[in-house]
């Protein structure tokens, strides 16, 4: 091992100086440390594989030998920092590199995931062509994040340094990166003990810290941009995504707010807020969907790692970031679709709500006491009875609403039917009734003539409309009259035959019929009142209309002759004809009501007769019961007397007499 290391020591030293800088302090064993680094040839990978087998034992042994931060006395007393320890430490670093840095074979399996880290530009034809690969020297951001998180963990301690208590970003700024001097930090707890210069310098630590902060800032800015936009970055959306990445390792690292739930400590905790897994990209361009980008469409991907530690770390980060990404995606979708979606209306589950609570909010029918008791005896609960009452109230209200709607419909239809009829009546009246000849009279007659014409037309219209209303409201009155005419004749015949008979029941029936006829007339008058109101007003208006003739009937002035022409006669005939029709309609209604009253009265009389028969039968039964009670009482007294006689005599003769008396008594009872 050492011979191979001596041949390749110069190449490794140059690479080491290029990466980490050159130590300013001199040490006699520095050359030996450069020659005995144990790295071997950079071109041969077999040594890395060989060292990987001994990595676990080296790590455990080094951790056993590695002093803690607070163990100062042991560190000062033991000689851990001699030239013999250097190869083991470097071998430990090589084992770490071999375990945590994936091989080329492992990288080829992730080509479809790594290619999507590049940027593409959309040309005019709509096909996206890949531009130059990102200038980031560290292609695999996820690999770098896992690597640096292992270095930045609190439990990881380099053997050549004491980790400061406040090793934050402010202590390692960009100004220290340009400095070529190597300042050895003094620790008061180690009694101003200086660090051996053959180990890795502070510049290496500054480089790693700045690299860690730069990666962290890049990922955090990416997360912030995705969180603000509510969606993933699209290829070719804006010019900000097309410029190559230029790392600024020498600048000051950006500051981040320390979250108590995410950061394990102030000193560069694990990558808890870094988006290791890449989110999905929308590959739609301005002119269509790119086929190549669809083939390389990146899904949520976890890189394949050869080390168990790296797999655990990447899995934890990926799961946490997937959860964050899903939550942000749901929030963004809800924000974008809030204006398009209808509000979510939640209907309560009525099956969970008790019946008593539901019934208190609903109208209920008052349940009588008898019905309530019968329902309870049938096995119903109070809640069930209340529910039945609520259902009955609902149906009752529904019927009322339906009846009101039907009445409104009927009123509307009647109005629509009566409107053209009244219009035709007015037209007929305007044709039939000529202008009055009072226009040739003086001013007094002229002043009264317009009112007369208006009143006459209105009177005729109202009178005819009342007749039509009667016909509309009672369209089946003629049919009813014709159907019940033979029944009326039968009633008349029965009345005549009953009149010839001289029984009391017949006289009583005649009296009932007379009272029923009077009641029928009253009912007919009550029913005809709404229709006769118009006729009464018509009569008044007709009287006003005839007032211009000087009260024809009362005063009989000669003006009667003047106006008794053929037209007035026709008008009077029409009036009389309408009045006769009205009287006929009233008679028909009265007859119908009379028939109904007669039938009801007959049924009432039958009920009364049945009641009388029942009363008489009950009276007879009570008399029979009383007679039986008397007989029983007499028999009991006779038995007592017989017993007394038997006890007093005590002889056979007395017994015989008693028996003879019994026989006589029984014979009497049987005869009765």
From Swiss-Prot:
The keyword Amino-acid biosynthesis applies. Residues 601-612 are annotated as: Basic motif. The modification Phosphoserine is found at residues 416, 564. Residues 375-403 are annotated as: Required for interaction with MET31 and MET32. A motif (9aaTAD 3) lies at residues 109-117. Residues 614-642 are annotated as: Leucine-zipper. Residues 312-375 are annotated as: Auxiliary. The keyword Coiled coil applies. Residues 1-44, 157-265, 299-347, 475-574 are annotated as: Disordered. Keywords: Activator, Amino-acid biosynthesis, Coiled coil, Cysteine biosynthesis, DNA-binding, Methionine biosynthesis, Nucleus, Phosphoprotein, Transcription, Transcription regulation. It comes from the Eukaryota. GO terms for biological process: cysteine biosynthetic process; methionine biosynthetic process; positive regulation of transcription by RNA polymerase II; regulation of sulfur metabolic process; regulation of transcription by RNA polymerase II; response to arsenic-containing substance; response to cadmium ion; sulfur amino acid metabolic process. The 9aaTAD motif is a transactivation domain present in a large number of yeast and animal transcription factors. This is Transcriptional activator of sulfur metabolism MET4. The lineage of its organism: Eukaryota, Fungi, Dikarya, Ascomycota, Saccharomycotina.
């Amino acid at each position: 091992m050492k011979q191979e290391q001596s041949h390749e020591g110069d190449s490794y030293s140059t690479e080491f100086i290029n990466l980490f800088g050159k130590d300013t302090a001199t040490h006699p064993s520095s050359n030996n440390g450069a020659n005995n680094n144990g790295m071997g040839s950079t071109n041969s990978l077999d040594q890395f594989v060989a060292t990987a087998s001994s990595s676990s034992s080296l790590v455990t042994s080094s951790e056993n030998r590695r002093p803690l931060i607070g163990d100062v006395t042991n560190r000062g007393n033991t000689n851990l920092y001699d030239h013999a320890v250097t190869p083991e430490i470097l071998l430990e670093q090589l084992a770490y590199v071999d375990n945590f840095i994936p091989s080329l074979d492992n990288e080829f399996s992730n080509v479809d995931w790594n290619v999507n880290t590049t940027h593409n530009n959309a040309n005019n034809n709509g096909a996206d062509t890949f531009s130059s690969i990102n200038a980031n020297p560290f292609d695999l951001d996820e690999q770098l994040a896992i690597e640096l998180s292992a270095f930045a963990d609190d439990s990881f301690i380099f053997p050549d340094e004491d980790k400061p208590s406040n090793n934050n970003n402010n202590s390692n700024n960009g100004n220290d990166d340009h400095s070529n001097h190597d300042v050895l930090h003094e620790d008061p707890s180690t009694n101003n003990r200086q660090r051996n210069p053959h180990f890795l310098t502070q510049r290496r630590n500054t480089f790693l810290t700045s690299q860690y902060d730069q990666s962290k800032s890049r990922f955090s800015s990416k997360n912030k941009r995705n969180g603000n936009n509510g969606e993933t970055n699209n290829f070719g959306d804006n010019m900000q995504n097309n410029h190559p990445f230029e790392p600024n390792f020498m600048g000051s690292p950006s500051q981040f707010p320390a979250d108590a739930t995410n950061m394990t400590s102030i000193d560069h905790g694990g990558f808890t807020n870094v988006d290791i897994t890449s989110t999905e990209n929308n590959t739609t361009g301005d002119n269509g969907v790119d086929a190549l980008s669809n083939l390389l469409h990146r899904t949520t991907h976890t890189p394949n790692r050869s080390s168990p530690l790296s797999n655990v770390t990447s899995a934890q980060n990926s799961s946490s970031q997937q959860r964050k990404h899903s939550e942000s995606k749901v929030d963004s979708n809800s924000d974008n679709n809030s204006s398009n979606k209808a509000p979510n209306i939640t209907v309560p589950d009525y099956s969970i709500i008790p019946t008593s609570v539901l019934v208190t909010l609903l109208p209920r029918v008052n349940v009588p006491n008898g019905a309530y008791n019968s329902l309870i005896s049938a096995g119903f609960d109070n809640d069930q009875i209340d529910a039945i009452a609520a259902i009955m109230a609902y149906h009752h209200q529904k019927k009322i609403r339906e009846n009101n709607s039907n009445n409104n419909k009927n009123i509307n239809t009647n109005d629509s039917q009566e409107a053209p009829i009244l219009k035709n009546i007015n037209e007929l009246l305007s044709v039939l009734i000529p202008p009055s000849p009072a226009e040739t009279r003086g001013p007094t007659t002229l002043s009264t003539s317009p009112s007369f014409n208006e009143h006459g037309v209105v009177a005729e219209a109202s009178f005819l409309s009342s007749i039509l209303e009667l016909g509309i409201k009672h369209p089946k009155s003629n049919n009813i009259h014709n159907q019940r005419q033979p029944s009326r004749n039968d009633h008349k015949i029965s009345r005549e035959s009953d009149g010839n008979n001289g029984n009391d029941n017949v006289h009583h029936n005649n009296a009932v019929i007379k009272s029923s006829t009077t009641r029928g007339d009253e009912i007919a008058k009550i029913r005809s009142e709404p229709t006769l109101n118009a006729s009464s007003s018509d009569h008044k208006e007709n009287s006003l209309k005839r007032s211009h003739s000087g009260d024809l009937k009362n005063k009989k002035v000669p003006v009667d002759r003047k106006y008794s022409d053929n037209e007035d006669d026709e008008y009077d005939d029409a009036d009389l004809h309408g009045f006769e029709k009205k009287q006929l309609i009233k008679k028909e209604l009265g007859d119908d009501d009379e028939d109904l009253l007669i039938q009801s009265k007959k049924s009432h009389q039958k009920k009364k007769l049945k009641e009388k028969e029942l009363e008489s039968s009950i009276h007879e039964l009570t008399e029979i019961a009383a007679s039986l009670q008397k007989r029983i009482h007499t028999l009991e007294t006779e038995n007592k007397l017989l017993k007394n006689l038997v006890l007093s005599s005590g002889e056979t003769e007395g017994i015989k007499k008693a028996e003879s008396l019994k026989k006589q008594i029984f014979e009497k009872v049987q005869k009765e």
